[in-house]
């Protein structure tokens, strides 16, 4: 069994449909940041929708597109034109420990297969079938819907991996037999004063061998990945907590608020305060 399959089966995603939305010409669906081990997903079946994220990114969804939010980030869906829009909304609940795995994924995953591909044909039939089953009282309906929702997630992760260099992302590190434990420790204790030496000791490797293996797998350095994860965790906290910036900065390993501020701007293109304001505006 491959590493991704083991990870997905270990966390056993449990999926549900929450809403079948039929929307008019002027609408908004705001969503606040939620529990970190829960994935929200939206499938567009008619019309078009705009998806706004706290980073300032804006995406347009078309019929047949499915978007999943692995970090349960704040977001807002809204109308694009005056046409009516139909959206199926649901969630996937994973084991609490899956929040570390989910943090290694991007904030948004899209399932938009190439026309007439096997995945496209399956998805075109799966969404209406899922809607029909969710309205029925047939035996096994909950299990069936859950498995279809989980398949959305698996296909979306696979599609994302296919679009990026599979040897150059944090997920590849998490799935690596020697480096996975290192990433796990970074995620569990972002505020620890990690050094390359202390990280190498987790992998039971020399500093030089560890640094070389890490670069071979990720294309970057251990401390660069640590910085990225620390800032991602900080962004998650800004979306969910009202703690002062300095407290959050210290909790993810920054002794100086100014250095944290500069790093956050480099990563997200906005200040911590601006990020919080964007989250507030997306889900007032």
UniProtKB/Swiss-Prot annotation:
One of its GO terms (biological process) is regulation of organohalogen metabolic process. Keywords: Activator, Disulfide bond, DNA-binding, Stress response, Transcription, Transcription regulation. Changing residue 75 to A: Increases expression of the target genes in the absence of HOCl. In vitro, increases DNA binding under reducing conditions. The keyword ATP-binding does not apply. Disulfide bonds join 21-89. Transmembrane segments: none annotated. Induction: Autoregulated. Induced in response to HOCl. GO terms for molecular function: DNA-binding transcription activator activity; sequence-specific DNA binding. Residues 177-278 form the HTH araC/xylS-type domain. Disruption phenotype: Mutants are more sensitive to HOCl treatment than wild-type cells. Residues 197-218, 245-268 bind DNA. The keyword Transcription applies. InterPro entries: AraC_lig, AraC_XylS_family_regulators, Homeodomain-like_sf, HTH_AraC, RCS-HTH_transactivator, RmlC-like_jellyroll, RmlC_Cupin_sf, Tscrpt_reg_AraC-type_HTH. PANTHER family: ARAC FAMILY TRANSCRIPTIONAL REGULATOR, HTH-TYPE TRANSCRIPTIONAL ACTIVATOR RHAS-RELATED. Involved in reactive chlorine species (RCS) stress resistance. Up-regulates, in response to hypochlorous acid (HOCl), the expression of three genes essential for survival of RCS stress (rclA, rclB and rclC) and its own expression. This is RCS-specific HTH-type transcriptional activator RclR. The gene is rclR.
């Amino acid at each position: 069994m491959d590493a991704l399959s083991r990870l997905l089966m270990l966390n056993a995603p449990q999926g549900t449909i929450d809403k079948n939305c039929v929307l008019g010409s002027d609408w908004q669906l705001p969503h606040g940041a939620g529990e970190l081990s829960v994935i929200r997903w939206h499938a567009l079946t008619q019309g078009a929708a705009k998806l706004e994220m706290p980073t300032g990114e804006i995406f347009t969804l078309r019929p047949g597109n499915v978007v999943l939010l692995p970090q349960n980030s704040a977001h807002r869906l809204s109308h694009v034109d005056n046409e009516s829009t139909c959206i199926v909304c649901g969630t996937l609940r994973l084991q609490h420990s899956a929040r570390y795995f989910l943090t290694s994924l991007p904030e948004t995953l899209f399932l938009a297969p190439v026309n007439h591909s096997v995945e496209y044909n399956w998805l075109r039939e799966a969404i209406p079938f899922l809607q029909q089953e969710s309205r029925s009282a047939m035996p096994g309906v909950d299990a069936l819907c859950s498995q279809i929702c989980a398949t959305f997630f698996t296909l979306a992760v696979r599609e994302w991996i296919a679009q990026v260099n599979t040897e150059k992302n944090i997920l590849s590190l998490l799935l690596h037999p020697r480096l996975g434990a290192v990433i796990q420790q970074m995620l569990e204790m972002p505020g620890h004063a990690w050094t390359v030496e202390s990280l190498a000791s987790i992998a039971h490797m020399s500093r030089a061998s560890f640094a070389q293996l890490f670069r071979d797998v990720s294309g970057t350095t251990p401390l660069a990945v640590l910085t990225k994860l620390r800032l991602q965790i900080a962004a998650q906290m800004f979306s969910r907590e009202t703690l002062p910036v300095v407290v959050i900065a210290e909790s993810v390993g920054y002794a100086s608020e100014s250095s944290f501020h500069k790093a956050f701007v480099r990563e997200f293109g906005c200040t911590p305060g601006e990020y919080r304001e964007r989250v507030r505006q997306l889900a007032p």
